[in-house]
Amino acid sequence: DGGAESEIEYENFNAVRADVDFKGFNIHPGSAKNTMINAALVAMEFDRMLPAGETPRDTEGYEGFYHLNHMSGNVEKANLNYILRDHDADNIAKRQEIMKEITAKLNEKYGADTVSLTLKEEYRNMAEKIKPNFHLIENAKKAVQKSGVEPQVIPVRGGTDGARLSFMGLPCPNLGTGSYACHGPYEHTTAEGMDIVVDTLTELVRLYGEMK
């Protein structure tokens, strides 16, 4: 599900979607003193209250983040859509708690139901399903080496199709496909890279065919 032909990945993000809705109160701005609640401004305040320096631009490796994916709004109503990501299960839980605390503080400041937060789990870190079946990683490393490149076992800063499959009973680490710059306008692969991937897969089949 993406990645350089040398990559082997069995750790992915725990993923949560957060939808934050803001309800404002509109009135003529000339007589708005202590009365108007601008939903768009409350939304901006919510975002400022999140921990600084924890966005995709600021993080790498095992560092998690809050990613503001979409925003819309006016005085009367606004919406912020975030994705929350973290490899560590405790940390993803803490990120959700922080959002709940911010919601409570803003509702205390502006009135009940000004801010409503909806959290939804999207997928989990497949490491807990792969580690008991670590032969998958050891054989993948052998197969990549046999294809002529040095294997790189790295954490996925995202999710993979294999993450869902792993929790459905089919432990499924991610193997690189020889693709680069994924999800952008310059996403590409090479014929040479695809040849290496085919060699890797062929070797994997051979290795498992010899297992008894």
Predicted regions and their residues:
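Midchain, well-structured core segments that form catalytic/ion-binding scaffolds
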Residues: D1-E97, E122
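Conserved active-site and cofactor/substrate-binding residues in soluble primary-metabolism enzymes
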Residues: N34-E45, E63, H87-D90, K94-E101, ...
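Active-site-adjacent substrate-binding region
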Residues: L41-D58, F65-H67, T114, R124-C172
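A common structural junction motif
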Residues: E54, K100-Y110
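Zn-dependent metallopeptidase/amidohydrolase metal-coordination segment
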Residues: E76, E150-T200
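Conserved short beta-strand edge segments in small beta-sheet-based binding/regulatory domains
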Residues: L106-K120
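C-terminal alpha-helix
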Residues: T200-M211
